[in-house]
Amino acid sequence: SLLFAGRFVDWLDTKKGFLWAIGIWSVGACLHAFCGIATSGIITGNWFVGFHGSKEIISTINDTALVINVSVALFIFARFVLAVGEAGNFPAAIKTTAEYFPKKDRAFSTSIFNAGATVGALAAPITIPFIAKSFGWEMSFIIIGALGFVWMGFWVFMYDKPERHPRVSAEELAYIQQDDIADSKLEGYVPETTSKVSFVDCFKYKQTWAFAFGKFMTDGVW
C-alpha cells in the first residue's frame, strides 16, 4: 500500500496528498466507533440509536454468531479505511522532509517525525483507557479521529512549498536548496540517470523478502 500511496502523493502534490491521507485516516478512526450502531442497524433495521442503545439491542439478539460476524466485518472495513490513510502518511512526510531539508539534514529530520509514532505508542496505554472508561470506548476512536481533522486545519494554513512560504527567508531558502545550487555549479555536471525496477522484479531480491518478513512479524503488534 505504501508503493501506491507514494505515487498518489507524488501525483497530488505534498499538501493535497497529506490532506487526503490524514482525512481518510481520521474517517477510518471515527468509523470504528459506529460499528455497534451499524451492527444493530444491519441485523434489526434499527439505525437511529445511540451508542448505549445499540449495546442494549445487540445484547438482546439471540444469534450471537451473526452479531460477531457482522461486527468483525465492520471493524475490518473500518481498519481498511484507516490503513489506506495511514499508508499515505509516511510518503507525504518523507516528501515534506525532502522539500524542507538539504540532504545532510534529512536523516535527522526524518528521525524526529518518525519518533512521533513511538511517542504515540507510549501515550496510548495512558490516555485511551482513561477516555474509554470516562466516556465509553466509542469516544476513544472519535476523539483520536477528531484530532486528525484538527491537524488538517493546521496543515492547510501553515504548510506551503519553501519557495512560496511567506515565513521562509532568502537565507533559509538558499540553505534548503544548497544541494541543487551545488549540483548546478559542477563543471560537466551530468544528471544521474536511473533505470526503473518493476514491482515484480523486487521479489527477486532476498533483501525484499527479509524486509517483508520483518514487517509481517512486527506490524501486527505495532
Indicate where each model-derived feature is located.
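Small-residue-rich segments within alpha-helical transmembrane domains of MFS-like 12-TM solute carriers
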Residues: 67, 83-91, 122, 219
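Helix-loop-helix hairpin linking two adjacent transmembrane segments in secondary transporters
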Residues: 118-166
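Juxtamembrane intracellular "pre-TM" segments in multi-pass secondary transporters
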Residues: 163-211
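MFS 12-TM fold signature
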Residues: 22-32, 82, 147-151
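Cytoplasmic helix-loop-helix junction between adjacent transmembrane helices
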Residues: 78-117
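C-terminal ends and interior cores of transmembrane alpha-helices
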Residues: 23-68
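Helix-to-loop junctions at the C-terminal end of transmembrane segments
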Residues: 2-13
